[in-house]
């Protein structure tokens, strides 16, 4: 239950501070801070936390300020006198009348307290610690700081804008004694008023944050005038943590945790507006511990250290580093391999609740004691579900767990992607890793854990049910075999992720390919005496050797990985050289230099390459043509509705696994890196899962005699950058063919260029492929072409490759080094730049279309407008992730919304629920 709503008394109406309980001796042993804390708990009043009383002041603050200024103006001030005046001023500031006088100081003929404080602080900084008056001046500064604190609090509570009143509440919490909260009753008998105070402070802070974001001018102007006092807020995170650790009341602890979250946002906003110093500007003396809530600023680097750090960051971009260096695969693999949960959407929701709901200990006990029902053999979700979260869901369902109004309100504010303005999700997606707060990192980790933990076992167990599911589907046998084949390929990849690949496939396959396939192309190149071509092959196969080492080291190198490596790194080169091997070794230069022979070689090589790399698409096209030309068995059109729902649900859950895995991977890569091999494995799973789902939907609609509705294309935030890589690949291929001297080289690189463009285009059109996978393939198949273009362009001017063995060796070494370092880095940058250009041109094209359509409509040319609109509609369908205004919609938003439960389950869809 929430504490009853208690209306605060006015800050100017203050009760006398009296001991809450205990005998006189107990009270006398209390420190002033402890006494203020006890009194604050008894009253819940802001002024009591600062020790303010209603006692009439013994002196007038205006006279004290004037006397202090006169003393400071003397050539030799009496520092004991200054200390006494400052102490008296601090005592006056604690009275109600003193508050009002200091709050209206600018209207009185008195010197400014802030200026006097700055003068004393400056004098103290210049005075050696061994000086006889150092202690007196230090006490004077302490008294002035106390008076200045009370003045700022008085002004912030008495003047508009009212939103600034959150600051006094927060400052009050820094003046409490945390250990008093842990004292046994009767010292502290109730947390009700304290909990309400913190709750109000949280609301006011949230309003202040909103004001600083929307209309900051007035608030910033007021707060900046009290920046010296607001520096005390730097200690607030540590104070809140200490209060939470000592607090014995669960609702109050929850309020303190929530307040800590909004306080973190406030401190960041105050730094952005220059009211508080940025973290990097906060210096810490040697040997001094950083203040609570502060992160120690990184020490300034020397020039050599900065160059070394920049060099390290550059090396991490090199292709060879990515092939050989260990990444963070083990962390993500360990999470996925842990035999814990597959989370259904409801369980996912519950998991996030645990991270933001902050259950009390009593509520946690209720959840822990909730029994889990027996899970049938076929219920994969129940058998693999996370225990605590499943219990939480059941406890809520059976009514044993009752949430407070505040907790229920939090449920309504869970991170959601219903709109792209969702603060939590937007922060996780857009902030760089270094800028994430601790709470944001916790949420990011929670989402990764919820989507990744235990997925491998659960997904494989789910896939093993497919034969039994298909027996109820009514689909023809050939379709069942096709679906089982796709299912088997996914399970094989899941098995590699779970257990690693066999030692044999890792150690033997890639070295065998290098030893068996490299000699022929190298021999042809050297015999043909085309130095530019042979040097490119030296660079090519040297990089293959580096990639070979990376494949041997990585535990995920399975048969599919080796096949992809062989096709991407060897096939085109070996094929082109095999065609020209006989005339080359026979010294038939006449044939080799004929244009017709070169064209025939390029066509044959290109056709074979396209056929091999598009073999699955070609087979699918033949099957489609066969089905249209002959009557095919569509299966049983009449199967029980219960069976149909079970089959549909199985395929939906399978796609749900794939989406969860992708979410976990994308968010994991926000903060860490994974190898290209692991990323390729996860991309393969996502692609096969999409094929699996699409194939079932098409054949199931055909079985039922229904027209399959055209589904929405998945959003792809990397589409334009991948398309930029396609344009870059095409331009590189064309330039390289022009630079090659021999027809053998021209034929090889012409076929290679066509193949590279087709492969990069397939990646661009596949929404399951992210930019890392696209850059990986670019490095493998286009990387050498990229560096060769520049290299041969330079050689065309100086011709160093033909100037003896020394010139050739130097050129080959430079080309090899460039091939091992530059392609991925250059491709990523160039692809992003080209992608931005394509996106810009698309937006301009849409704007031109809209203007043309308006003009055509005005002229009455409705037919032309309709055709134009249809063409643009087709274009928009072909370009994924676009909405009105040219904004790219990040695909993760939709997936996150699916996982947080707003996506209907198959059962809800069947029942017609929203």
Curated annotation (Swiss-Prot):
Pfam families: HopW1-1. GO terms for cellular component: extracellular region. The keyword Secreted applies. Keywords: Secreted. Belongs to the HopW family. Its main location: secreted. It comes from the Bacteria. Residues 1-31 are annotated as: Disordered. Disulfide bonds: none annotated. The lineage of its organism: Bacteria, Pseudomonadati, Pseudomonadota, Gammaproteobacteria, Pseudomonadales. Residues 1-13 have a biased composition (Polar residues). InterPro entries: T3SS_HopW1-1/HolPsyAE (IPR029378). This is Effector protein hopAE1. It is found in: Secreted. The keyword Secreted applies.
């Amino acid at each position: 239950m929430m504490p009853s709503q208690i209306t605060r008394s006015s800050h100017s109406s203050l009760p006398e501070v009296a001991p809450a309980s205990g005998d006189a001796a107990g009270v006398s042993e209390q420190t002033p801070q402890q006494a203020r804390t006890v009194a604050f708990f008894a009253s819940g009043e802001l002024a009591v936390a600062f020790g303010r009383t209603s006692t009439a002041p013994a002196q007038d603050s205006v006279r004290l300020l004037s006397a202090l200024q006169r003393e400071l103006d003397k050539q030799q001030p009496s520092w004991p006198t200054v200390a006494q005046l400052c102490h008296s001023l601090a005592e006056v500031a604690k009275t109600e009348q003193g508050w009002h006088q200091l709050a209206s100081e600018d209207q009185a003929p008195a010197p400014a307290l802030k200026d006097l404080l700055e003068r004393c602080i400056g004098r103290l900084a210049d005075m050696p610690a061994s000086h006889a008056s150092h202690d007196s001046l230090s006490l004077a500064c302490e008294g002035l700081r106390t008076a200045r604190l009370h003045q700022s609090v008085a002004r912030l509570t008495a003047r508009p804008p009212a939103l600034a009143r959150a600051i006094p509440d927060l400052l009050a919490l820094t003046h409490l004694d945390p250990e008093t909260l842990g004292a046994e009753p009767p010292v502290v008998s109730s947390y009700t008023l304290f909990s309400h105070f913190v709750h109000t402070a949280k609301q006011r802070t949230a309003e202040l944050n909103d004001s600083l974001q929307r209309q900051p001018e007035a608030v910033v102007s007021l707060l900046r005038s009290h920046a010296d006092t607001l520096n005390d807020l730097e200690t607030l995170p540590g104070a809140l943590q200490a209060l939470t650790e000592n607090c014995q009341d669960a609702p109050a602890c929850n309020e303190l945790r929530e307040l800590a979250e909004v306080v973190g946002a406030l401190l960041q906003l105050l730094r952005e507006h220059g009211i508080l110093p940025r973290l990097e500007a906060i210096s810490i003396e040697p040997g001094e511990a950083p203040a609570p809530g502060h992160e120690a600023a990184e020490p300034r680097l020397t020039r050599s250290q900065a160059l070394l750090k920049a060099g390290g960051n550059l090396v991490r971009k090199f292709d060879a580093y990515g092939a050989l260096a260990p990444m963070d695969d083990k962390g993500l693999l360990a999470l996925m391999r842990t035999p814990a949960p597959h989370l259904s959407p409801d369980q996912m929701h519950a998991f996030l609740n645990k991270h933001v709901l902050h259950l009390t200990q009593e509520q946690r006990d209720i959840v822990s004691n909730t029994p889990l029902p027996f899970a049938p053999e076929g219920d994969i979700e129940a058998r693999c579900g996370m225990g605590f979260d499943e219990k939480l869901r059941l406890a809520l369902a059976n009514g044993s767990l009752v949430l407070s109004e505040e907790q229920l309100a939090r449920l309504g504010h869970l991170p959601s992607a219903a709109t792209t303005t969702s603060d939590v999700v937007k922060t996780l997606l857009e902030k760089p890793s270094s800028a994430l707060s601790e709470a944001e990192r916790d949420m990011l980790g929670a989402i990764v854990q919820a989507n990744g933990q235990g997925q491998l076992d659960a997904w494989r167990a789910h896939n093993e049910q497919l034969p039994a599911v298909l027996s109820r589907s009514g689909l023809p046998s050939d379709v069942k075999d096709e679906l089982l084949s796709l299912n088997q390929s996914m399970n094989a990849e899941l098995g590699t992720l779970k257990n690693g690949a066999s030692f044999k496939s890792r150690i033997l396959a890639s070295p065998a390919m290098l030893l068996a396939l490299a000699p022929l192309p190298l021999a042809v190149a050297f015999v043909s005496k085309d130095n530019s071509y042979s040097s490119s092959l030296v660079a090519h196969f040297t990089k293959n050797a580096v990639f070979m080492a990376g494949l041997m080291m990585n535990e995920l190198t399975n048969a599919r990985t080796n096949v992809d490596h062989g096709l991407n790194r060897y096939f085109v080169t070996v094929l082109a050289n095999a065609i020209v091997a006989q005339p080359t070794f026979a010294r038939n230069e006449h044939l080799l230099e004929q244009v017709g022979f070169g064209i025939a070689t390029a066509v044959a090589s290109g056709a074979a390459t396209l056929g091999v790399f598009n073999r699955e698409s070609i087979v699918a096209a033949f099957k489609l043509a066969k089905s249209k030309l002959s009557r095919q068995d569509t299966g049983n059109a009449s199967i029980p509705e219960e069976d149909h729902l079970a089959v549909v649900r199985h395929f939906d859950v399978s796609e749900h696994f794939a989406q969860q895995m992708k979410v976990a991977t994308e968010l994991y890569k926000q903060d860490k890196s994974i190898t290209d091999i692991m990323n390729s494995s996860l991309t393969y799973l996502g692609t096969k899962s999409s094929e699996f789902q699409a194939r079932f939907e098409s054949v199931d609609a055909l079985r039922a005699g229904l027209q399959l509705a055209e589904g929405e294309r998945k959003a792809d935030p990397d589409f334009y950058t991948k398309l930029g890589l396609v344009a870059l690949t095409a331009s590189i291929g064309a330039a390289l063919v022009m630079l090659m001297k021999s027809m053998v080289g021209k034929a090889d690189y012409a076929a290679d260029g066509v193949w590279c463009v087709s492969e990069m285009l397939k990646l661009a059109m596949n929404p399951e492929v992210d930019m890392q996978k696209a850059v990986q393939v670019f490095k493998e198949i286009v990387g050498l072409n990229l560096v060769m273009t520049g290299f041969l362009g330079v050689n065309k001017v100086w011709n160093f490759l033909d100037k003896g063995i020394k010139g050739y060796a130097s050129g080959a070494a430079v080309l090899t080094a460039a091939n091992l370092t530059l392609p991925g880095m250059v491709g990523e940058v160039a692809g992003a730049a080209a992608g931005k250009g394509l996106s810009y041109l698309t937006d301009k094209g849409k704007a031109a279309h809209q203007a043309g359509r308006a003009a055509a409509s005005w002229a009455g040319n409705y037919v032309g407008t309709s055709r134009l609109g249809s063409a643009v509609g087709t274009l928009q369908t072909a370009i994924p992730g676009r909405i009105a205004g040219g904004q790219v919609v990040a695909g993760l938003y939709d997936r996150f919304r699916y996982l947080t439960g707003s996506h209907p389950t198959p059962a809800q869809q069947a029942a017609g629920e929203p």
